[in-house]
Regions:
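Extracytoplasmic gating/loop element in the C-terminal half of outer-membrane beta-barrel translocons
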Residues: 19, 24, 31, 43-46, ...
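Conserved small-residue
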Residues: 1-48, 399-400, 406, 410, ...
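Flexible, solvent-exposed loop segments that connect beta-strands
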Residues: 48-52, 236-242
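Short, surface-exposed beta-strand-loop junctions and turns on beta-sheet-rich folds
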Residues: 91, 581, 618-620
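Conserved SET/PR-domain catalytic core that frames the SAM/AdoMet-binding pocket
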Residues: 519, 529, 563, 584, ...
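Residues embedded in well-ordered regular secondary structure
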Residues: 1-97, 135-137, 181-190, 199-203, ...
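Extracellular/periplasmic, surface-exposed regions of secreted and cell-surface proteins
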Residues: 103, 107-118, 123-128, 132-149, ...
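Glycine-rich, aromatic-lined ligand/substrate-binding cores of catalytic
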Residues: 591-626
Length: 761
């Protein structure tokens, strides 16, 4: 049930559970003055009678997170060589007791000069990370924390029934009790990563001062393995009550070979020329595995071998890219600059007829203050710049009819015949069809800008405008089940982006012991979906059936799609005969892209002390907050505290007149918020906020030739002013396309306070 029941002070007089009234419980156990019966306490084997009081379930649930970071770096310069060794460790205890992280890293690098012309070196890094996570959306921990009424002692009442740790005891039975889930549901992520390179270089000036040649060959590797375990214990609401486990992960190894030859020619006092040619080979080997199991044979062992039903998948990819590139840069009197580049790529992950593509760029710069006529004491630097660039991008193409062992049936999503049957295994086509005419995606960028500094850099100004046009965008188009597949990987999308970026900086105090600078940056980014594939008006990027985040043709990218308010021809929200808002059709109910982003940063150095601060401002844009909407629906938000008040919804009646129908009665708010829960648009909020991102202080205690000692302290995310109620707008979740647009019982953002010290000797 919801928390819309009687007031806490009236619980003892509740006709069903009150200890002051005649009901089934007092008839059996006698009256308990001033108390009320709590069924969950009885299930846990406790005294079922409790005195009404308020509990701060969220405060009781969350801990204070702690992060420890330690690092040691040893470096030495020798006559013709140098080396460094770095060791690091980070340990983090999360704000939920079952979460945390441990990371260890080591880095070794060395360089040596073999002869006057030859040198060599290497860099090697190894990182191991282990993370204990908490699931949020879906059957997440916070659903029972935020939705529990303040009269319920979530932390004090055991999360399982007396004598059976695998039968939950919860206020909201459709979701796992948060404390039970911390003990029985485990989500882990373990990653081991190695990356590094080795190089050899040759350089010469040919015995002159005007010519320099540098040739460098480098080979590198970036290999990692990430293993995930998502397990719901026996008794969880996920997995039908008998548990569920998913083991999955990736092994990825990318090998890189890079050869560059750089030639620099100082032609004369006016002209300079630089040319670079090179070759790059990238080989990527990926392997994905997936194991799914459900219905544990017995409780207490969350393991795939304990599952009665198991499913496994394995996929491998191999991609190779061979690229040839070059650029030529010319300069005139350190005033005019022109650069031309080009790259030809040959890829293996495209259809055979479309495996090569060329993308060029051109850029120019003009430093006006190098002209004698413009040299002055007011404008000490002024530069104009312009550029055009193309970037090609291949897709992940496979030959059609790549098959995986599964079941056969006649329809993609229906399985009337189950295999293997009598020892015969069936196969079905891969669920994605790949367009045999797939072309590389192409992005064309245009940019103009200016940089101007005044009064010996007392004031600095920069402005950039850029436009990106993406054509032949590669994306997956959903298909009907009758096609035998679920997706088609093809070209078709066109997106363009307009970006304005403005930076203004000041450095009013510049002395030996005191320096103060501050800067503002303003950015406006507008992404537009011009078109998708023929016949496709929108594509889901994540979410539920409704609401969800979409890319929609003719709209800004992305948009929120869901059930909206029903409106009249003038856009006014309509109400029914009871004064309740009417649910309309599924439609675009929010636009995610902000109007602008603005940042402010400042640094003040006072002798040995440095103080800095960062402030961010996001204006406009919208996001969907399921947490806020359900808090209203359950009656646990501050907005629902006026239980005796009446509500007149701001809308219009179907006859076109302003709504004046009052929603009244003891359960008026419950009825009202229950209706809003059916309308996704009611949970779409303005995403504007201003946040004091960081304040930091550093003080040098000791600074001598052989040793340096400093201490530092910081505070992050300490103040926020936001339109979204209850939550930090940056507590959204999802992939990159959904980030900032969708929130469903997300982990709260945290304020962080820390200190540290550095020793150099």
């Amino acid at each position: 049930g919801h928390s819309w029941g009687p007031k806490r002070a009236d619980l003892a007089n509740d006709p069903t559970y009150g200890g002051n009234t005649d009901n089934a419980f007092t008839q059996k156990m006698g009256k308990r003055q001033g108390q009320y019966y709590v069924p969950q306490r009885a299930e846990a084997g406790l005294d079922p009678w409790a005195t009404p009081q308020a509990y701060d379930n969220a405060k009781d649930f969350f801990d204070t997170g702690i992060t420890w970071s330690n690092s040691l770096n040893v470096a030495q310069m020798l006559d013709k060589s140098s080396y460094s060794i770095s060791l690091g460790n980070t340990h983090q205890d999360g704000i939920i007791s079952s979460t945390g992280m441990d990371r260890y890293n080591v880095k070794v690098s060395a360089d040596t000069k073999l002869t006057n012309n030859w040198s060599s070196g290497f860099t090697a890094n190894y990182i191991t990370t282990s993370i204990d996570k908490a699931v949020t959306s879906g059957n997440g921990l916070l659903r029972t924390v935020y939705a529990a009424p303040p009269s319920y002692d979530l932390a004090g009442i055991p999360s399982h029934v007396d004598g059976n740790p695998y039968t939950q005891n919860s206020f909201r039975g459709s979701f796992d009790n948060a404390y039970w889930a911390m003990e029985n549901n485990k989500f882990t992520e373990d990653t081991n990563r190695f990356f590094g390179n080795v190089y050899a270089s040759y350089q010469t000036d040919f015995g002159t001062t005007n010519h320099k040649l540098n040739a460098k060959y480098m080979v590198g590797v970036d290999a990692y393995t990430t293993h995930y375990v998502d397990s719901y214990g026996y008794g969880s609401n996920t997995g039908g009550g008998r548990g569920q486990i998913e083991n999955y992960g990736w092994t990825n190894a990318t090998y890189n070979s890079l050869l560059t030859i750089n030639y620099d020619w100082h032609i004369n006092e006016d002209w300079g020329l630089n040319a670079v040619v090179g070759n790059e080979i990238i080989q990527s080997n990926r392997k994905k595995y997936y194991e799914y199991g459900t219905n544990y044979n017995f409780p207490g062992w969350n393991h795939i071998n304990n599952a009665t039903t198991q499913q496994t998948e394995e996929e491998t990819w191999k991609n190779r890219t061979v690229g040839f590139f070059g650029n030529v840069s010319a300069s005139y009197r350190n005033m005019l600059y022109l650069t031309l580049t080009g790259r030809q790529d040959y890829v293996s992950n495209m259809p055979r007829n479309n495996r090569s593509f060329f993308y060029p760029s051109i850029s120019a710069g003009f430093i006006l203050t190098e002209l004698d006529a413009l040299k002055n004491n007011i404008v000490n630097h002024a530069k104009l710049r312009v550029s055009y660039a193309e970037v090609g991008q291949a897709g992940d193409f496979l030959e059609n009819y790549y098959s995986t062992p599964t079941y056969g049936g006649g329809f993609y999503t229906l399985t009337p015949i189950m295999y293997p049957m009598k020892g015969t295994t069936a196969y079905t086509p891969y669920y994605t069809i790949f367009d045999p005419k797939l072309k590389p995606q192409n992005t064309r960028s245009y940019e103009v800008g200016a940089d101007v500094n005044f009064l010996d850099n007392l004031i600095t100004f920069s402005y950039t405008y850029s436009r990106q046009n993406v054509k032949d965008q590669i994306f997956e188009v959903p298909l009907a089940s009758s096609t035998g597949a679920s997706k088609l990987l093809t070209n078709g999308g066109k997106i363009h982006t307009n970006t304005h970026e403005f930076t203004l900086g000041f450095n009013p105090i510049r002395t030996k012991n005191i320096n103060w600078d501050f800067a503002f940056n303003w950015t406006k980014i507008d992404n537009y979906v011009d078109e998708l594939a023929p016949g496709v008006e929108n594509i889901s990027l994540g979410g539920y059936v409704t609401p969800q985040v979409r890319a929609s043709a003719g709209e800004k990218f992305p948009v929120i799609y869901g059930v909206g308010f029903k409106r009249d021809a003038n856009g006014n929200r309509l109400v029914d005969e009871n004064g309740l808002p009417i649910a309309g059709e599924a439609q675009v109910i929010g636009k995610v892209s902000p109007d602008f982003l603005m940042g402010f940063n400042t640094t003040l150095r006072l002798w040995k002390c440095t103080i800095s601060a960062v402030l961010d401002w996001k204006q406009g844009g919208q996001m969907y907050s399921r947490t806020t909407g359900l808090a209203d629906y359950y009656g646990v938000s501050k907005r629902t505290e006026n239980r005796d008040g009446t509500i007149i919804f701001d809308g219009y009646k179907t006859d076109g007149t302003k709504n004046d129908i009052a929603i009244t009665g003891a359960n008026a708010q419950q009825v009202y918020y229950s209706r809003l829960n059916d309308i996704d648009e009611s949970s779409v909020y303005d995403n504007s906020f201003i946040k004091l991102r960081e304040v930091a202080v550093n003080y040098k205690i000791l600074q001598k030739r052989s040793i340096e000692l400093s201490v530092n302290a910081f505070a992050r995310n300490i103040l926020i002013w936001a339109q979204l109620p209850d939550l930090d707008p940056e507590a959204s979740q999802g992939n990159n396309n959904m980030a900032g647009a969708f929130e469903d019982y997300s982990m709260p953002q945290t304020a962080s306070f820390g200190f540290g010290f550095n020793i150099k000797f």
